[in-house]
């Protein structure tokens, strides 16, 4: 199963608040790509494949390489879900451990999802456009280009994208 979509995401937790337009694609099992577009190109490109996650900040020439776990995604994005659990949320399946989940359905896929994550963070994702079983290039889930970029940790990565 694959998915490609454009979302408006609002995330609120005791330590973080943010809103963003997100371009997101996934292919099961275990492949996720997320981009935060900016005025001159992507501000952030996140690719998770199997057990590895890359977060590339083209404008900052910075890269984070870490595990593709719920803990690492929480440290980076504030979302304590695995890549496959993010996929579940977007196709209308409540992952185990969510405190609350509500999907407002379009004809085939949810058009809006509201969830309270295991850590209490509240996530609202409004789907602007989405396609299920999208024809995605395998290269979409390759390690993003980052030759010559400096290595950063999750706290610096979070600071870079959330400012």
PLM features per residue range, with description:
Residues 16-20, 44-48, 97, 121-124:
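Amphipathic hydrophobic-ligand
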Residues 97-163:
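Non-transmembrane domains of secretory- and envelope-associated proteins
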Residues 1-15:
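A short, Trp-centered hydrophobic/proline-enriched beta-strand micro-motif
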Residues 22-26, 48, 100-104:
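Extended lipid/amphipathic-ligand handling interfaces
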Residues 7-11, 33-37, 112-117:
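Short beta-strand segments that buttress and anchor functional surface loops
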Residues 27-83:
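An acidic-aromatic
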Residues 6, 17-25:
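Beta-strand-dominated lipid-handling architectures at cellular/organellar boundaries
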């Amino acid at each position: 199963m694959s998915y490609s979509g454009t979302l408006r995401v609002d995330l609120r937790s005791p330590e973080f608040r943010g809103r963003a337009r997100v371009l997101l694609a996934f292919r099961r099992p275990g492949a996720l790509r997320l981009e935060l577009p900016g005025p001159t190109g992507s501000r952030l490109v996140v690719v998770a494949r199997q057990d590895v996650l890359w977060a590339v900040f083209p404008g900052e020439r910075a890269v984070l390489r870490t595990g593709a776990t719920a803990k690492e995604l929480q440290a980076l994005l504030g979302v304590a879900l695995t890549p496959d659990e993010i996929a579940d949320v977007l196709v209308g399946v409540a992952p185990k451990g969510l405190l609350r989940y509500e999907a407002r359905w379009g004809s085939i896929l949810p058009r809006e999802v509201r969830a309270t994550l295991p850590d209490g963070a509240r996530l609202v994702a409004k789907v602007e456009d989405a396609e299920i079983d999208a024809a995605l290039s395998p290269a979409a889930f390759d390690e993003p280009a980052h030759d010559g970029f400096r290595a950063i940790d999750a706290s610096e990565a979070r600071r870079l994208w959330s400012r």
